[in-house]
C-alpha cells in the first residue's frame, strides 16, 4: 500500500473495475427485497453544475447504503433531452439541436462517471430518441380514444422571443421564466390532456404520501384548489344572455353590489362595440397578461360596461364592470363582488365609488366599521332580509337552497387546476401524433405510422420551427387519403412524466411498459430533486402514473413512496461597477479576499485590481457568475472529497454554502483515514479479536465503535441526516487515531474498527473505501460487503454517570458500576470532596435515589 493518498490514481482504477464488472447492473429478483432509488434526470446542458452533484451524491449515498443492507437496488440515469435551450445553442453555434444534445450527453456522462455514481448504465435513456418517444405518442393516441385528450382554441401566454406558449406557472412578473421577455396574449388551437378528470384523486391521494414533504403537498393542494360553492345565474337587462358567477361565500350574497367580468368576456366585447374607453381597456388587458400569482399585488383597474344585472333575491339592479382582476380561463370569467366582505372588491369599489353594503356582523355583534377595509371574517348575518341572524354555515345552506329552488343557483365543486396544455410551437420536442384529413377530420396518427419521427438533420433560423417551415414534412396519407400532420410538439414535461417507469424496461419493444418488470420495481422508493418542481413536474408525474395504472400497465396508485427535496447550493457573489454603471459579476474563484478574525469577508478585489462589492452567499447561477465547476474541484481534490463535503456541509434538505476551506477539510480527513489504515496494515497480519480478553480501555473503545455503527445506521437509514452520520465517523476516527496499537488485541480491535469505518464511509466515498477494504483484506469487493451491524453486547455500559445533589443543588457527578447498590453509590458520593463538605456536621434527613441517574441528599 502506498503511503500517500492519491485520489487521481485510485479513482480511475476503481471506476474501470465497476465498468468491467458491471457492478451496478441489476435485474428483477423475487428472492430479494427491491429498492428503487431515483434522482431527477438531468437536462444535458453541456456541463454538470454543483446542484447536479449534490442531487446525485445524495441519491448515490442512499443507493449504496441500501445495497449494503442486501437489497436489490436499482439506480438508473438518463437524459431529459428535448427542450428550448438546445434550439438557442444550435443557432448560436451554427449546428442543429440533435448533435449539440448528443455531444453534451457524451460529455456529461463522463462527468457523472468521474464522480463515481453507481448507476445501472445499461438502462440509460435519452428522451429525444424515437425509441423513447414513440411510446409516449402511442399513449397519447390511446388517451385521445378514451376522451382524455381534446383540442381547443385558447388564449395562451405567448413569448415573442422564444416563439412558444408558456404555462401560467412559467410566467413570472408578466415575463417569460426563461428569457425575461414580456409575455403577450394570443389565441391559438392547442392540445390538452384532461388532468381535471383526476383532480379529486390527485388531491385525495396526497394523504397517502406520508413520506413527501408537507410543503410540496400543500403547494399541490393549493394548485389543485378544490372549493365548494354555488353557481348563480343573473339576468342582464338589454343583453341576450345571462351571466353566471361562482362563489364560495353565498352567505355574503345579500351584500353583492356589482358584478365584474374578464376583459375577454362576450359581455365586455359586446359593450365595447359602442364604448371606445372599454375597447382600449380590453386591448390593454389582452397585452398585459399576468400570472395568477401576481393578481394580488397588481393595481386593480376597470371600466363600467353600462350593462345592469338583476340581483335574483333583492331585484335590485347592479352595475356590471369589466375588470383586470377577473380571468376568463378561471371559472366562468365573471365574479360577484361583495365589497363589504372581500378586500379586493372593497379596494375596487372605493376606487370607482361603488356601493359598499355590509351584511356580516363583527365578532362582538356590532355593525362592522368599513371606513378603512372590508370585514373578511365569517360571522352572523344582518341587513339580509329573511336570512338575518344566521351564522355562516346556516346562511350558506339557506341561501344556496333558496337559489336552487328558484332555478338560479346550483351547488358546485370547483378547481383552480386547469387542463394540461401540451402543445408547443417549437421544433426540438416529440411531434404530437395527430393528423387532419382533407375534409377537416382530426384523428390520431395510425399505429403503423408511429413513431412520427422528428427529423434531426435540420437548419435552424432561430425563429420558425423547421417542421413548420418545411411544408413537405407535414404531408402524409391516412387510409389512402391525403392528410396533414400536426406540426406542434409536446411540452417537454410529457417526457419527464413517465421516464421513471421506462427505466424498469428500457429495451421493451412490445409497448410502453413491461408490466411485470414495472410492477417489480415500482413505486420508486425514494425520489430526489429540487422543490422548484413541486407543482409542475411532480403533479404531472403523479397524474401520468394514474393514467398508466388505468391503462393496466402499473398496479400502484402513486409513483414514489418518498420524496426528498435537496437544498440549493450557494456560493459567494462579487461584482464591480463598470464604466456605464453596469454590474460586472466576478467568479468567487477570481476574487482575492480579506477576512476579519471571524472569517467574514471584509474586502475583495480581482486580479485586475477592481474593488469588488461582496453581496453575500446566493444560489450558484450564470447570471451572478458564482458557479463552481465540479470538474475543477474533482481534479484538484478527487471525487470522494467533493462527495464527502457535499454530504457533510449541511443537512440534505437545507441550503449548502460552498466553502473551499470546507472541501480542504474533507480532503484532510480522508488523508487521515488513509494514513491510519496505512500505519495499521504496515505492521502485518492481525490476530483474531477475543472480546472476553479485552481490558476496560479496549472495551470502552469497542463500545465507541459499535455505538457509532448504531448511530450512523440510524442517521443514514431512518433519519437521513447524512451530515451527522459523517460527524459521528469523524469523532470515532479521532479516538482511533489516539488508540494504542502495540498489543495483539489492540491491533485486532483496530482491524474491527477500521473495517467498520471503511464500510460506513463507503456510501459517501466509495473509491477510497474500495481500495482500503482491499488493503484491510476485507472479504470480496466492498460493493458486495454487508453493512456493519452494531453488537448490542459491546454497547452495554459497565459504568454509569450519577448526578449527586445536596438539597437539590448539583455538587458532583460520579462514575459508578451499572450494578452498584444505593449504599455503594452513597458511599462513593461521600468520598467526593465537594459533597463531603456539605454533609459535614449535618443530618441527612432524606435520600432520593433514581438508580443509575440521580442521588439527592436532603440535609438539615
Curated annotation (Swiss-Prot):
InterPro entries with a match to the protein in the record: aa-tRNA-synth_I_CS, aa-tRNA-synth_Ia, Leu-tRNA-ligase, Leu_tRNA-synth_edit, M/V/L/I-tRNA-synth_anticd-bd, Methionyl/Leucyl_tRNA_Synth, Rossmann-like_a/b/a_fold, tRNAsynth_Ia_anticodon-bd
What positions does the record give for the motif labelled 'KMSKS' region? 619-623
- Keyword Lipid biosynthesis assigned: no
Binding locations of ATP? 622
Q: Which GO terms describe its cellular component?
A: cytosol
Q: Which UniProt keywords apply?
A: Aminoacyl-tRNA synthetase, ATP-binding, Cytoplasm, Ligase, Nucleotide-binding, Protein biosynthesis
Q: Which reaction does it catalyse?
A: tRNA(Leu) + L-leucine + ATP = L-leucyl-tRNA(Leu) + AMP + diphosphate
Q: Molecular function terms in GO for this entry?
A: aminoacyl-tRNA deacylase activity; ATP binding; leucine-tRNA ligase activity
Q: Where does the motif 'HIGH' region lie?
A: 42-52
The compartments listed are: Cytoplasm
E.C. designation(s): 6.1.1.4
State any GO BP term from the record: leucyl-tRNA aminoacylation
- The primary location reported for this protein is cytoplasm
- Please report which protein family the annotation says this sequence is part of: Belongs to the class-I aminoacyl-tRNA synthetase family.
- What is this protein called in UniProt? Leucine--tRNA ligase
Q: Which species is the source of this protein?
A: Escherichia coli O157:H7
Amino acid at each position: 500500500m502506498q503511503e500517500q493518498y492519491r485520489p487521481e490514481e485510485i479513482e480511475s482504477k476503481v471506476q474501470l473495475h465497476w465498468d468491467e464488472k458491471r457492478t451496478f447492473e441489476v435485474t428483477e429478483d423475487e428472492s430479494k427485497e427491491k429498492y428503487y432509488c431515483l434522482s431527477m434526470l438531468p437536462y444535458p446542458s453541456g456541463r454538470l453544475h454543483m446542484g447536479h452533484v449534490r442531487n446525485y451524491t445524495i441519491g448515490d449515498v442512499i443507493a449504496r447504503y441500501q445495497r449494503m443492507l442486501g437489497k436489490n437496488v436499482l439506480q438508473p440515469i438518463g437524459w431529459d433531452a428535448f427542450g428550448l435551450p438546445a434550439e438557442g445553442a444550435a443557432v448560436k453555434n451554427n449546428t442543429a439541436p440533435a448533435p449539440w444534445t448528443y455531444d453534451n450527453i457524451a460529455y456529461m456522462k463522463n462527468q457523472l462517471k468521474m464522480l463515481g455514481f453507481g448507476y445501472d448504465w445499461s438502462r440509460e435513456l435519452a428522451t429525444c430518441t424515437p425509441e423513447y418517444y414513440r411510446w409516449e405518442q402511442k399513449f397519447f393516441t390511446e388517451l385521445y380514444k378514451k376522451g382524455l385528450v381534446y383540442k381547443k382554441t385558447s388564449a395562451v401566454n405567448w413569448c415573442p422571443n422564444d416563439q412558444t406558449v408558456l404555462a401560467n406557472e412559467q410566467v413570472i412578473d408578466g415575463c417569460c421564466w426563461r428569457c425575461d421577455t414580456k409575455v403577450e396574449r394570443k389565441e391559438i388551437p392547442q392540445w390538452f390532456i384532461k388532468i381535471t378528470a383526476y383532480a379529486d384523486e390527485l388531491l385525495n391521494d396526497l394523504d397517502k404520501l406520508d413520506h413527501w414533504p408537507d410543503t410540496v403537498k400543500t403547494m399541490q393542494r393549493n394548485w389543485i384548489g378544490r372549493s365548494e360553492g354555488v353557481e348563480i345565474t343573473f339576468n342582464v337587462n338589454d343583453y341576450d344572455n345571462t351571466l353566471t358567477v361562482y362563489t364560495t361565500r353565498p352567505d355574503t350574497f345579500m351584500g353583492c353590489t356589482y358584478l365584474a367580468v374578464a376583459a375577454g368576456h362576450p359581455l365586455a366585447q359586446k359593450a365595447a362595440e359602442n364604448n371606445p374607453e372599454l375597447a382600449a381597456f380590453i386591448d390593454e388587458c389582452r397585452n398585459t397578461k399576468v400570472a395568477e400569482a401576481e393578481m394580488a399585488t397588481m393595481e386593480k383597474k376597470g371600466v363600467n360596461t353600462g350593462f345592469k344585472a338583476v340581483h335574483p333575491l333583492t331585484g335590485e339592479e347592479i352595475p356590471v364592470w369589466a375588470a383586470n382582476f377577473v380571468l376568463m380561463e378561471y371559472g366562468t370569467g365573471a365574479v360577484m363582488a361583495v365589497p363589504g366582505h372581500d378586500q379586493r372588491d372593497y379596494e375596487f369599489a372605493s376606487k370607482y365609488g361603488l356601493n359598499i353594503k355590509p351584511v356580516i356582523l363583527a365578532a362582538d355583534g356590532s355593525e362592522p366599521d368599513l371606513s378603512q377595509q372590508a370585514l373578511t371574517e365569517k360571522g352572523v348575518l344582518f341587513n339580509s332580509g329573511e336570512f338575518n341572524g344566521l351564522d355562516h354555515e346556516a346562511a350558506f345552506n339557506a341561501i344556496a337552497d333558496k337559489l336552487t329552488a328558484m332555478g338560479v343557483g346550483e351547488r358546485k365543486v370547483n378547481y383552480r387546476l386547469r387542463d394540461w396544455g401540451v402543445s408547443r410551437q417549437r421544433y426540438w420536442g416529440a411531434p404530437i401524433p395527430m393528423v387532419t384529413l382533407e375534409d377537416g377530420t382530426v384523428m390520431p396518427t395510425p399505429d403503423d405510422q408511429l413513431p412520427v419521427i422528428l427529423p434531426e438533420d435540420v437548419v435552424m433560423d432561430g425563429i420558425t420551427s423547421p417542421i413548420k417551415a418545411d411544408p413537405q414534412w407535414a404531408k402524409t396519407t391516412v387510409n389512402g387519403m391525403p392528410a396533414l400532420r400536426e406540426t406542434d410538439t409536446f411540452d417537454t414535461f410529457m417526457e419527464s412524466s413517465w421516464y421513471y417507469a421506462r427505466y424498469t424496461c428500457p429495451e421493451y419493444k412490445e409497448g410502453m411498459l413491461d408490466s411485470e418488470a414495472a410492477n417489480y420495481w415500482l413505486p420508486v422508493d425514494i425520489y430526489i430533486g429540487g422543490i422548484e418542481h413541486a407543482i409542475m413536474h411532480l403533479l404531472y408525474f403523479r397524474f401520468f402514473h394514474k393514467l398508466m395504472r388505468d391503462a393496466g400497465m402499473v398496479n400502484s396508485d402513486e409513483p414514489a413512496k418518498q420524496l426528498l427535496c435537496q437544498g440549493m447550493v450557494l456560493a459567494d457573489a462579487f461584482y464591480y461597477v463598470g464604466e456605464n454603471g453596469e454590474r460586472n459579476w466576478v467568479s468567487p474563484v477570481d476574487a482575492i479576499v480579506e477576512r476579519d478574525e471571524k472569517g467574514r469577508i471584509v474586502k475583495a478585489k480581482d486580479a485586475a485590481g477592481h474593488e469588488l462589492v461582496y453581496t453575500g452567499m446566493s444560489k450558484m447561477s450564470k447570471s451572478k457568475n458564482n458557479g463552481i465547476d465540479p470538474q475543477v474541484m474533482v481534479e484538484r481534490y478527487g471525487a470522494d472529497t467533493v462527495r464527502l463535503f457535499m454530504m457533510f456541509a449541511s443537512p440534505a434538505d437545507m441550503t449548502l454554502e460552498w466553502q473551499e476551506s470546507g472541501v480542504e477539510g474533507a480532503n484532510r480527513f480522508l488523508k487521515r483515514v488513509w494514513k491510519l489504515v496505512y500505519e495499521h496494515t504496515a505492521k502485518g497480519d492481525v490476530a483474531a479479536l477475543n472480546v472476553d480478553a479485552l481490558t476496560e480501555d479496549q472495551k470502552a473503545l469497542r463500545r465507541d465503535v459499535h455505538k457509532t455503527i448504531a448511530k450512523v445506521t440510524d442517521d443514514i437509514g431512518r433519519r437521513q441526516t447524512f451530515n451527522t452520520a459523517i460527524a459521528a465517523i469523524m469523532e470515532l476516527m479521532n479516538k482511533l487515531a489516539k488508540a494504542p496499537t502495540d498489543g495483539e488485541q489492540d491491533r485486532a480491535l483496530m482491524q474491527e474498527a477500521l473495517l467498520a469505518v471503511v464500510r460506513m464511509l463507503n456510501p459517501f466515498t466509495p473509491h477510497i473505501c474500495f481500495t482500503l477494504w482491499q488493503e484491510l483484506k476485507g472479504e470480496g469487493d466492498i460493493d458486495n460487503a454487508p453493512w456493519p451491524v452494531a453488537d448490542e453486547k459491546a454497547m452495554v455500559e459497565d459504568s454509569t454517570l450519577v448526578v449527586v445533589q445536596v438539597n437539590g443543588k448539583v455538587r458532583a457527578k460520579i462514575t459508578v458500576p451499572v450494578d452498584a447498590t444505593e449504599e455503594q453509590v452513597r458511599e462513593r458520593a461521600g468520598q467526593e470532596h465537594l459533597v463531603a463538605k456539605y454533609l459535614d456536621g449535618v443530618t441527612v434527613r432524606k435520600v432520593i435515589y433514581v438508580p443509575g441517574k440521580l442521588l439527592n441528599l436532603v440535609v438539615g
